[in-house]
Amino acid sequence: MTTYNLCIPRVFNTFDESQIRTTFEQLNFGHIDKVVIVRKKNEKFNIAFVYYRKWYDNENAQRAIARLENNQDIKIVYDTPWFWKVTKTNPR
């Protein structure tokens, strides 16, 4: 199975790696290797990347993978009604 890594192009600059990791761990997509935030100076938003070591074989992960393979984004609700539009990065 291809291991997709994810990009969150717009993350409020108040979020840290731990908060993003916790949100994605709750989705149970797979085993997260690391979360990296690219900080933008004097901006309200940063860019974040979620790197997976392995994706799980469960319904939630399969739905996400199906969307990613069709070059569609995934809507991740982190605090109702707030959400991130998440896209794939290049596979490892």
Give residue ranges: language-model regions.
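Canonical RRM/RBD RNA-binding surface and closely related RRM-like beta-sheet modules
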Residues: 2-47, 51-60, 69-71
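"Short basic amphipathic alpha-helical interaction patches in structured regions
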Residues: 63-65
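Low-complexity RS/RG/RGG-rich segments used by eukaryotic RNA-binding proteins and nuclear co-regulators
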Residues: 67-92
